[in-house]
Amino acid sequence: MSPVKTSTENKVDPEKTAGSDLEKIPLPDVLKNLEADPSAGLTAAEAQARLAKYGPNALPEKKVNPIRKILGYLTGPIAYMIEAAAIVSAIIGHWEDFAIIFALLAFNTTLDFWQDMKATSALEALKKGLALDATVMRDGKWVGVKADRIVPGDIVKIRLGMIVPADMRLVSGDYASIDQAALTGESLPVSKQVGDLAYSGSVVRQGEMIGVVVGTGLNTYLGRTAKLVAGAGAVSHAQKAMFTIGNFLIILAVILVIVLVLIEVYRSLVVAHSFDLADAANLLQLVLVLLVASIPVAMPAVFSVTMALGAVALSKQGAIVSRLESIEEMAGVDTLCSDKTGTLTKNQLKVGDPILISATDPKDVIKWAALASQASSGDPIDKAVLEAVTDASLVAGYTQGKFVPFDPVTKRVEATLTDAQGNTIHAAKGAPQAILALTGISGDAAQPVTDHVARLAARGYRALGVATSSDGKQWKYLGILPMSDPPRDDSRSTIADAREKGLRVKMVTGDDTAIAKEMAREIGLGTNIIAADEAFPKDMNPDHLPESTKDLVESADGFARVFPQHKYAIVKALQQRNHLVSMTGDGVNDAPALKQADCGVAVSGAVDAARSAAALILTRPGLSTINSAIDEARQIFGRITSYTIYRVALTLDIMFIVVAGTVFFGLIPLTAVMIVIISLLDDIPIMTIAYDNTVISPRPIRWRMPRILSVSALLGVFSIIQSFFWLMIGFAILHHPDWSTNLGLTDEAHLQTLVFLQLVVGGHLLLLITRTEHWFFLRPFPSWQLLSAIIATQVVVVLICGFGWFVPALSAAMIALTWAYNILWMIILGVIRKVTEVWLDGRTSGRAHHTELVHQPLQPHLHSS
């Protein structure tokens, strides 16, 4: 086929069109606009000038200053408070405190840096999809050049096995079969002819053609997908929760600091009539204690460790977590957007029961279709037909001679065969209408074939016509082979399980609407499948979609004829309607939506770009692993929620007891070192909460901050009352000579130790209350890991207080009294927690109730009590 000649139509500015108009306008106009000559190509000088104008054919790298990136991790409410505490420690010379606080800050920064580095890998994976070398005509000769040196207007040759190096319009050649499944989601290679567009990053499976480059770098289909990935990304709900909690505690701490400073300055200037450097240092120390007490410094680490242990459990079930926050977000996912090809289906064509036209035996239709196929071609249709042959004797004894591969013009394949007796037979297979033309059947005689094809299309099947001839002239139409990409064996059950967990499943596919509807019917989805190009505005902005479009997205069971920008917009639309969205996929075309989704899931066999953009990567085929992931996520979420309630309540207790002791007794009830020890002892059991026995919610669960803060505040208030009463009792003992002597509480330093012991014992007993919404003495019981950690830390704190390690020693009697007092308050707080939950349940509709006990702990050898 000869090259296309140029015409004299108006030009289109290639720099302004970014390749999009050049994909649509007539081919002669493309050549004229790009000043491209298919017979000579560009000169070296022209290529160099265009390279300078349009840039390299590569995805640009965004360079980030490492120092600026690290400094970015040191911002935020919790980080600011940690830094403030460290600065105050340095000012007053408390270098031990400074070292401990700085070490915690460094740990959190390192963890953030590691997580952020993983986020940049999506673009790197997309770059790997680009071709490395290309055959280009320069100065009238075919030469090999690096793909990143290709420019718009270059004449490029593509052939079997090559990766298309740039978006190009094909200008000459017979045909090419191009696999663009990773880009568009189409399950079969697409036949290309002169004038068609070949996408950058797609793979040539058959044929050889020549094209003119119309888009490079970010101006290609692949490049625009990469740009979407770069701009995608949702803020972690765990981060939002930590910021909310941090802000709540910081505001409270600032108020308390102001109150304390005013009181202390008043006492020094008005009452004592003096305020020297020593007073200022003491005041700074007081501020330091309050700041350290107000900061949940271990909260980011505890969140990460809890989710990391959950990630280990998920990996054993065939799901690898690339972004830890996705675990808790999976717990709240209420909408699952699933790619069809290779995710809900096997991505393998399968032949259905043959439809007979003139043949009398269905096996004959399969037999002659197989004889018109080649196993070595790699063609998925040939593979499916050959796999449909269950009896090898059907095709034995035949020798394939001449073979004419698929021709996009005739739309069929022909083979000349010789049987064991030396007879020649011709076989053909192809589009049903093409086989009709080959057999010469027309008019009413062709109606049965047309009707069968229409019925198959309505059910989502592709149709393959089969014919034979003894002389190559007179052909007999044997029958039609229905072909489909069948659903995975577990797809229907997985979708049913997902619905039981409160998830709405939506199918998203690049295939035609009829195919999508049939697949939806087979796997138990609804059949409200909408064509994406009809649903979305032509020049849509995903951030400002019409309300009507959002309504459509919410109500639809799935979308057909979907392109990357549609998938991305579907996720955005659902998120704008307050849905937590999980998106599954396996191709480059899925990457933007995978990254934007609250929990992107790359299924088994996904390309690198999809795996890098996803938060969860499945190593086993199908979606069944997602059900296990959801259960695990909801367990972990329950544990994190329990920790959050505990941490806020205990922090309130510590902050207010410091203020109360200072205001009412003129005593700082805790030293900074004591607070650091409390923090360490409290977080040891928390690290084992990842192994705790909890319950699974049958519905999606989210961060309900008003409820969490309400429960935390109420428990915190009663914990403050508990601690304040014990401080009052201790103060009374201290000022009663007989009690003071008998119980060994002889000075304010011992009183500080008493408060320290009460907070550690009471705090750990409080953890047993916050770990469940039900009565703390009923199932599920604490795991042996959590219980062992609590017992171990209690032994440690008793030894610290009994032997006077780091603190003045307490008597055995005082330690025993402290334990008895806290056990009594544990019962009181347990009643308060249960009554609070019942009251909140009465006020809150649509609450996710925890009803199912977890029977499988994180590790196989661990068992619940």
List each model region and its residues.
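Non-lumenal N-terminal regulatory segments of integral membrane proteins
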Residues: 1-151, 156-164, 169-177, 181-247, ...
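Helix-interface capping motifs at the ends of transmembrane segments in multi-pass membrane proteins
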Residues: 80-100, 252-295, 312-318, 651-674, ...
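Hydrophobic alpha-helical transmembrane segments
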Residues: 92, 96, 100-131, 236-335, ...
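Conserved beta-strand/loop elements of the cytosolic catalytic core of P-type E1-E2 ATPases, chiefly
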Residues: 107, 111, 141, 214-217, ...
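Basic, amphipathic juxtamembrane/active-site segments
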Residues: 177-179, 184, 346-366, 521-525, ...
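Membrane-embedded transport module
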Residues: 260, 306-309, 527-583, 597, ...
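Cytosolic catalytic regions of ATP/NTP-dependent phosphoryl-transfer enzymes
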Residues: 329-477, 483, 496, 505-524, ...
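C-terminal transmembrane module of polytopic membrane proteins
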Residues: 733, 753-865
